């Protein structure tokens, strides 16, 4: 005979690397006149799964109120937006702010948009680069991105650069 075993992927993904869980079940065989019972035991081993990047989005607008659209996955402390899991939200603050991704197993691109509040152009300035998580700082046009050695990152807007934007104009550091 044969059998097929389909692991509960959610339970298997929750295992730490090197961890294990055992599942077993009984089966009965028969030759038409006699039967016997056997047990199949399956051990699922945890591995270090490759990270899956989830985009985090933070928007800082000058002269407004601090809000977060997806508060179920975020914690606000002062002028910081700490993200865990997949996030898409707005951080709107009247002073300098930072955005921290605390998931050390994932890496993703970071896009920050600065906006002045009223009237004017809606043009966007964008650039794109890739950076390693080695504890370095990268200075963009409108702020500084610091990538921690543990994979965390913080973006701090530069007030002088964002003050140069016209009212209603936005710019993106990517």
Question: Which residue ranges define each predicted feature?
Answer:
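Acidic/polar, solvent-exposed loop/turn segments
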Residues: 1-174
């Amino acid at each position: 005979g044969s059998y097929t075993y389909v692991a509960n992927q959610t339970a298997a993904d929750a295992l730490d690397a090197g961890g294990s869980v055992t599942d077993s079940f009984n089966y009965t065989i028969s030759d038409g006149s006699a039967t016997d019972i056997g047990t199949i035991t399956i051990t699922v081993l945890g591995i270090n799964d490759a990270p899956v990047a989830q985009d985090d989005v933070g928007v800082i607008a000058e002269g407004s109120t601090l809000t977060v659209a997806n508060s179920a996955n975020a914690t606000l402390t002062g002028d910081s937006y700490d993200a865990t899991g997949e996030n898409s939200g707005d951080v709107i603050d009247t002073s300098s702010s930072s955005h921290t991704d605390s998931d050390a197993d994932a890496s993703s691109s970071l896009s920050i948009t600065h906006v002045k509040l009223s009237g004017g152009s809606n043009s966007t300035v964008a650039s794109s680069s890739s950076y390693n998580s080695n504890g370095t700082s990268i200075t963009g046009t409108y702020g500084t991105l610091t990538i921690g050695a543990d994979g965390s990152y913080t973006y701090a807007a530069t007030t002088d650069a964002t003050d140069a934007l016209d009212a209603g104009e936005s710019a993106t550091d990517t």
